[in-house]
């Protein structure tokens, strides 16, 4: 699922332009790129609404470390991206794994019905990896709206450029919504 064609000519040109600075440590907080991504998505230029990590797995690990405590439940469907289970288990949480629907989509109704007082997080891969199926955007909006606000909803959009509508605009309405995107799959 990585780019088999190599970097674009523009990327090579940009790297060549900066090669004289490779001896300098990069900004560990990625301030400039966080600011630019934030502004691109309708936030102020503080960068406070953007986190940069090494792939979706890095973000999921951070979310697990910050939010998941022993006994907390995290709901997701399988088959899907394996890092959800890993982030839960590493932090002593309990994965609540549900099957996909017959048409291989995340079963939002079953996920909602699985919510308990121990539910801390819900993870939705949209489009799903490995099936490529997409959850209807209106159904996803309704789901996000009705989930209790103390539950973190993670929508993993690593493959969003291949189908579906991004949930990024919904971040402005729902403080419990985290949207993950990546540079390695698209953009």
PLM ranges: what are they?
Residues 1-57, 62:
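N-terminal small-domain helix-loop-helix segment of the aminotransferase-like
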């Amino acid at each position: 699922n990585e780019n088999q064609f190599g970097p674009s000519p523009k990327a090579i040109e940009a790297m060549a332009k900066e090669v004289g600075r490779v001896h300098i440590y990069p900004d560990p907080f990625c301030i400039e790129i966080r600011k630019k991504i934030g502004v691109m998505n309708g936030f102020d230029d503080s960068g406070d609404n953007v986190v940069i990590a090494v792939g979706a797995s890095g973000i999921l690990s951070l979310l697990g470390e910050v939010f998941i405590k022993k006994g907390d439940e995290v709901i997701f469907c399988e088959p899907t991206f394996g890092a959800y289970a890993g982030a839960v288990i590493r932090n002593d949480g309990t994965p609540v794994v549900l099957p996909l629907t017959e048409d291989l989509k995340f079963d939002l109704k079953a996920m909602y019905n699985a919510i308990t007082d121990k539910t801390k997080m819900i993870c939705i891969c949209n489009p799903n990896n490995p099936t490529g199926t997409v959850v209807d955007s209106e159904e996803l909006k309704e789901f996000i709206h009705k989930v209790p606000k103390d539950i973190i909803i993670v929508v993993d959009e690593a493959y969003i450029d291949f189908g579906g509508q991004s949930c990024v605009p919904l971040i402005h309405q729902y403080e419990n919504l985290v949207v993950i995107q990546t540079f390695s799959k698209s953009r």
